[in-house]
């Protein structure tokens, strides 16, 4: 049996118990893939992470990210929460307000802004993204599983499949009320995601000026609705960026978790260059809710 420091971090909130929790286990180099997966299944959170020594010189640490069912190459809220945990614990120190995370998706640069924990925002740049093709049949099946009105698409851009670590089908609805009124059929939605090799569906609609309400559904990995989803927010950034006709920079906030009695907030910045490449940055706050030791 080995002893490991452990923190449970609430992400996309600085109040505690209002965002999305991630379990962070330190000094996990001696844990096997099987052990990490077993622990993630036991914590039963949407993601559990394991901090290891980096294998790339530029990185401050290596992060393994697990859902209860599988390992992910990248995920947003575990990235922000784990960065907060390693800095708060003194595991590593930011250099010029930067931390470099190594994960299966490659190197992820994080920026830390703010002097005090309650004022600190941690943001990451999406390590990569791909806009993929998907079938009209699959989109129709998702719309049916979510109970989306048939005429919604005349008011917004069409759905887009985006791979930014996980694969999200991103759907825009006319407004936040439409998003909150969705009543998903999770079994049907899970089957569509399984058939098409997606992790899930992220839906968003306008809440106000430069703000959106969003919901992310991933029943295939036993996360019917994620209280706050960083990669989902990043996919929304890619979706919005891909619709821009000229080079531009824009930013907006995303509210998430409303239907789960949470109050999660993320900030998204999008830079679209003259060659149509898109840089997306997702930021959030975090707070330690549980700290102690685990015995494995």
Curated annotation (Swiss-Prot):
One of its GO terms (molecular function) is isomerase activity. It is an enzyme of class 5 (isomerase). SUPFAM superfamilies: Diaminopimelate epimerase-like (SSF54506). InterPro entries: Phenazine_PhzF-like. Keywords: Isomerase. The active site is at residue 47. Its EC number is 5.1.-.-. It comes from the Eukaryota. GO terms for cellular component: cytoplasm; cytosol; nucleus. GO terms for biological process: biosynthetic process; regulatory ncRNA-mediated heterochromatin formation. Pfam families: PhzC-PhzF (PF02567). May have isomerase activity. Enhances target gene silencing when coexpressed with antisense RNA. Belongs to the PhzF family. This is Antisense-enhancing sequence 1. It comes from Schizosaccharomyces pombe (strain 972 / ATCC 24843) (Fission yeast).
């Amino acid at each position: 049996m080995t002893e490991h420091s452990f923190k449970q971090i609430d992400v996309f909130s600085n109040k505690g118990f209002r965002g999305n929790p991630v379990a962070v286990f330190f000094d996990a180099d001696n844990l096997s893939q099987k052990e990490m997966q077993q622990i993630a299944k036991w914590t039963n959170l949407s993601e559990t992470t394991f901090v290891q020594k980096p294998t790339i010189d530029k990185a401050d640490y290596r992060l393994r990210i697990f859902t209860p069912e599988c390992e992910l190459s990248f995920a947003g809220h575990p990235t922000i929460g784990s960065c907060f945990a390693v800095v708060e614990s003194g595991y590593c120190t930011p250099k010029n307000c930067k931390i470099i995370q190594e994960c299966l998706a490659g190197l992820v640069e994080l920026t830390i802004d703010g002097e005090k924990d309650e004022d600190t925002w941690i943001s990451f740049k999406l390590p990569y993204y791909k806009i993929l093709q998907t079938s009209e049949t699959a989109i129709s099946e998702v719309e049916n599983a979510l109970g989306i009105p048939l005429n919604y698409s005349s008011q917004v851009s069409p759905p887009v499949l985006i791979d930014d670590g996980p694969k999200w089908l991103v759907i825009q609805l006319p407004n936040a009320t439409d998003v909150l009124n969705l009543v998903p059929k999770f079994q049907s939605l899970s089957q569509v995601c399984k058939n098409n090799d997606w992790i899930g569906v992220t839906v968003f609609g306008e809440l106000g000026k430069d703000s959106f309400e969003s919901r992310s559904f991933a029943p295939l990995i036993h996360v019917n609705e994620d209280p706050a989803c960083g990669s989902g927010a990043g996919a929304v950034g890619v979706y919005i960026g891909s619709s821009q006709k000229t080079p531009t920079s824009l930013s907006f906030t995303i509210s998430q978790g409303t239907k789960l009695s949470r109050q999660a907030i993320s900030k998204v910045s999008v830079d679209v260059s003259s060659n149509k490449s898109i840089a997306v940055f997702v930021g959030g706050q975090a707070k330690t809710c549980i700290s102690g030791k685990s015995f494995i």
